[in-house]
Amino acid sequence: MKITLKDGSCKEYAEPMAIIDIAKDISEGLARVACVAELDGEVVDLRTVVDGEHELNILTFDSDAGKAAYRHTASHVLAQAVKRLYPHAKCAIGPAIEDGFYYDFDMESLDREALDKIEKEMKKIVKEGAELKRFTLPRNEAIEFMKKREEPYKVELIEDLPEDAEISFYEQGEYVDLCAGPHLMSTKPLKAMKLISSSGAYWRGNEKNKMLTRIYGTAFTKKADLDAHLEHLADIKKRDHNKLGREMELFTTVDVIGQGLPLIMPNGVKMIQRMQRWIEDEETKRGYMRTKTPLMAKSDLYKISGHWDHYKEGMFVLGDEDKDKEVFALRPMTCPFQYYVYKASQKSYRDLPCRYGETSTLFRNEDSGEMHGLTRVRQFTISEGHLIVRPDQMVKEFKDCIALAQYCLQTLGLEEDVTYHLSKWDPENPEKYIGEPEVWNETEEDIRNILNELNIPFTEDVGEAAFYGPKVDINAKNVYGKEDTMITIQWDALLADQFDMYYIDEKGDKVRPYIIHRTSIGCYERTLAWLIEKYAGMFPTWLCPEQVRVLPISEKYADYAENVCQKLTANGVDATVDNRSEKIGFKIREARLHRIPYMLIVGQKEQEENKVSLRSRYKGDEGQVALDDFIADITEEIRTKEIRKIEVSEEK
């Protein structure tokens, strides 16, 4: 038997060997820290016996596969602990995930005290150091095996497998789990584990199924790494827009209004309106014409566009097709409406491109299980646009749409946080799309060439295109690592035909235009959530709902403070006065808690000299400055949308 290792060296053995024994032969130290192995490119257990010629790479916790196996084993330890403490609990699934693991159980909900007890039991199991033993059973025997153990969810999983499947299990002590693996050799290597939280989760992610109890945890080989991760999680919780946005009174939700229907509070409205005005002005500079179209339309419109056949389940339909003469639907997008704006008059080739922009309110019937804060909602506002262009204009206009998106991201300080994706059709499921394969392949190649010409790194995602065309999705991750699409730019060579759109070319012939569907900043609610988490509420000054707070040191200077505030307001600065009869130190601390960029402290000297004492979150105490100079500086900062660097960790 000949084994070629990752470094190119070879090991030869006279008889078959388990990978763990090969690891020991290489180094006892390596064997102690090994988690799994890569055998001819496939991740396998260390208990796997090999024979013949193979390429072998021993993987530790430092590798992704090693981490996954380590944490997957920890999830089995969690399940064993739960079964010991709650024998009535039924096990569902328990995979490793990024940064940890979870396990779903059919059982009562759990509080922090219960999680701590389970965690304590997990540590006992680790000390026992039970070996994990893998065995297999034919499908029918596997079903009977799990029925005897009264694990209905495991039975259901096995029943979904082919008749001739060989089912694998892992046993550790008294606990046995249905699992494909791979796993550690025993529970003993699990050093630093922590149960993070518990929540509800529908069986198989389907809200029609039973709600299970999901326990989240994580595991590391070193306590120091676990502590660092827990500190990171604490920071994430502080930044979570669903928590921080409510604390800052940017938005709220109310049960009687409904899931996915947030109330944007006055502070949040200020931020969204500033972004809207900026985007609308920028689009106007770039040649966009504004439209205002209805929030709903008859089903006839969506039947023409294809949305009725391909997207109806995502729409709010008003009426019953079997009973009502006319059925309406709230719009999930603006495109078909703007097509009729284009069609309202005949266009010549000289009139193109026609760039239409609208700040649109849209409605999408998202699953209740998908709702989360501002990132997944049922009603949202978006800077949507559609460009009707000649085929020879398509590449330039598409590039310009990318440039606009990049400008918006850069202005908001978000450009380093995004990834680009070419979302393609799935040729294995052509029924999901309209148009011929050649058109799809050509348009995808056009987008690919554009991204390469612009030197934009991107990944290609099969099956993520809309039903009428491929697109560029610009995505970002939230604080929990979940990726959402922030901006979309789509190439459409098909819908003009559906709507009989045309222009007259230089020969007098009717020609089909191409269409670009695009957003400049995407959904404002989702962007607000992104900004909250990015800046932990410490927004760039131009976006802050309150930009300056004037703090008189006593009631004697309230009039001067009001005068300062009025001058700021007259210059477009969002300023307030804290004229309460509180100590100045209290007022300063409260302004800092409210994340106000600038505090202007005024007393006798400031009043006499028409100055203010400036404290900023950027540099702390900046001393006295002339009021006119401060107004000039902050208005310039707001006008240029500058993102100032915070140079002090805490204001003194």
List the predicted regions and their residue ranges.
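NTP/phosphate- and nucleic-acid-binding module
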Residues: 1-90, 97-652
